[in-house]
Amino acid sequence: MKSILSQLKTAVSEALIKAFGEDLKDTDPLVVPASNPKFGDYQSNVALSLTKILKKNPREIAQSIIEALDIADTCENPTIAGPGFINFSLKPSYLATLLKEVQQSDRLAIEPAENPQKVIVDFSSPNIAKEMHVGHLRSTIIGDSIARILEFRGQDVLRLNHVGDWGTQFGMLITYLKEVYPDALTKADALDIGDLVAFYKKAKVRFDEDEAFKEASRNQVVKLQSGDEESQKAWQLLCEQSRREFQKIYDILDIKLTERGESFYNPYLADVLTALDEVGLLEEDAGAQCVFLEGFKNKDGDRLPLIVQKSDGGFNYATTDLAAIRYRIKEDQAKRIIYVTDSGQAGHFAQVFQVAERAGFLPDDVEVVHVPFGLVQGEDGKKLKTRAGDTIKLKDLLDEAVNRSRADLEKRLAEDERQETADFIEKVSQVVGIGAVKYADLSQNRTSNYIFSFDKMLALQGNTAPYMLYAYVRVQGVSRQGGIDLSTLPTDTPIILEEAAELTLAKHLLQLSEVLMSVEQDLMPNRLCEYLYDLSRKFNQFYEACPILKAEGDRRISRLILADTTARTLKLGLSLLGIEVLDRM
């Protein structure tokens, strides 16, 4: 079914044409959820926007719209407030009818997108020979959630992992390993990621201090780039070692990705320069090939160049990103390309997108968008680090979340004198620990920095994953207590919405599709988190105010349907955030 918001927008659009003629057929009906319940459920200020066009008083325009509206089955009589706002209050009978559709649908009656597109979500993107750190957490979690929501909406999503698998660091690392540990370049599993990172750090020190080593490293890069068999094999072994470590993290987080690293685009880099030259954008500056940017200037007021080929003939990130855009549009046929990286790269992407547009790489029907996110901070408000001042490894952070979740659970079990199996304790600890980390990140406006606090994210109260999971568990508890299989509730029993808490919950349950459409457009997963938090609160209020199992007849079944629909909505919503649910905690 179409969302309530979509239905009301259509109704207001039709009323505008009926009242004022075809000239207004493309007018935005400006229907939004009401800012305050005292104004009803939805509002439109379209009458105010038409005063100049129609040369009429906005209240008079609003009255004409109301008289032309055909929503008697949907809403109570609309009212006019203030200078000309139209307020809509939904009828309980209409809500009950929609909830019956939701009850009988695997998708909660949420329609997929009318015109699905090929969408690429580029996220996570760690570097080979380096461990994933807390900065990769945000890209991985936010990108995964965006991909899940787009997939649920019916878009054809390609999830790409643009790993850093190319560049001078490999010449440096291979040269160093040849000296100190040649087995690592010929034997799989000769070293683990921790060793690889340590070797990388030592190689970097040598590179910075030893000119002969620096020269040997650069020669090694040339050999690698020219396809030298021994160098290629060594490079592939190093990549494979890192890949296995990345996969361990992705398995813990339940992340699905297609790897397509920087090296994939190597054959297409020269073509980028040719294409830029053909449209007259390529210029030489201090021996480098570049494109001078519009709107980007240095401190002297001169236009900034985007370098696409260095003076030594090497290519860089900008060249690779331009090649990737061309490939993704021409070969993958993408209509929307989403890049999920930290906000520090906003300038880079703005420059790359500008050059791609000016060069004609971007057709009018293709959207490229950077989805930036802020820093993860410690409780001191500074960038999250270990006590020794090092970057926190992602694996260590996730292990800590699960361990703390386990400790909280074991403490509760002891206080309640509850006995549970080791398997139960392990499962709950994993789901709550990992879910808490994901939700704490996703519930923030992604553009903001956020304070990482295990105590806050694992709390059973407040806007946390455990609070949401507990609301779901509560419904399953009703099922167990009443000996009721919620999946077999009758579909012909009317839904009764007489109590205020029933009505409030029903309205909220029917807003999920509006929220998902909003996230699909604006790529802000925190809106889904806010919706789920409000849903959990409204359900808990309903649970306290409206006894479920003590009710009788149709009222009992109606409340069971409301509870089950809440649980199904929580399960779907949390799954779109990459979070599992539990029947018991």
UniProtKB/Swiss-Prot annotation:
Its main location: cytoplasm. It is an enzyme of class 6 (ligase). A motif ('HIGH' region) lies at residues 126-136. SUPFAM superfamilies: Anticodon-binding domain of a subclass of class I aminoacyl-tRNA synthetases, Arginyl-tRNA synthetase (ArgRS), N-terminal 'additional' domain, Nucleotidylyl transferase. Keywords: Aminoacyl-tRNA synthetase, ATP-binding, Cytoplasm, Ligase, Nucleotide-binding, Protein biosynthesis. It is found in: Cytoplasm. The keyword Ion transport does not apply. PANTHER family: ARGININE--TRNA LIGASE, CYTOPLASMIC (PTHR11956:SF5), ARGINYL-TRNA SYNTHETASE (PTHR11956). Monomer. This is Arginine--tRNA ligase.
